[in-house]
Amino acid sequence: MTDQIPAGEPPLGSLACPEPEDRPDLWPTTARRTDDGELVLGGLAVSEILAEAPSPVFVLDEADLRGRAASWAAAMHEEFWPSYGMAGGEAFYAGKAFLTTKVAQWVLEEGMGIDTASRGELAVSLAALQEVDGEEATTDGTRLGLHGNGKTQAEIAVALTHHVGHLVLDSLEEVDLAVRAV
C-alpha cells in the first residue's frame, strides 16, 4: 500500500471542514477556536466534551438551536402575518432530524411547532409540550403535526385525541382510517 494520493484526486487537506470564521453558516453560532487552536462549542472545549463522552459523540448546541428556532418562528409569523393578506405562518422543527424531549422543549419554548412522522415522535413531542404548556397540553396538540407514509389507525387516533394541529393524510385509505378513528 502507498500513502500517495492518486493522480487527479484532490489532496486530503481539501476535505477538511472549513474554520468557523470562514463558514459560520456551517457551525453553531458559539463555535470558535481558542488561541492555541482548540475548537470550542457552546462554551466547552472539544477536549472537555471528549473527556466526558468518548468519541464518537453528538454535540448539540442549545443556544444555537434556540436562536435558530426563534429566528424561524419570528420570520414565519412576520412574513405571513394576516394583516399582510396572508393566512398566517408557522415554523415546524422536523422531529426526524433529531428528537429528544429536551430538544422538543427547546424548540417549543422558542415558538416553533414540531413535525412528527411516527407515534414515537408524537409521544416525545406531546411529553415535551406538557412540560412547556402544562397539564392542558395533554389534550391540546395544536402546535404539533403528524405526517408520514403508512400511518396506522392507532397513530391517527392518538393525533386526533390530542388535537394535533396539522394531520397530513397521504391517501384515501388514511382518510378512511381517520374517519374510523373518531
Residue ranges and their predicted role:
Residues M1-V182:
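A charged N-terminal "starter" segment
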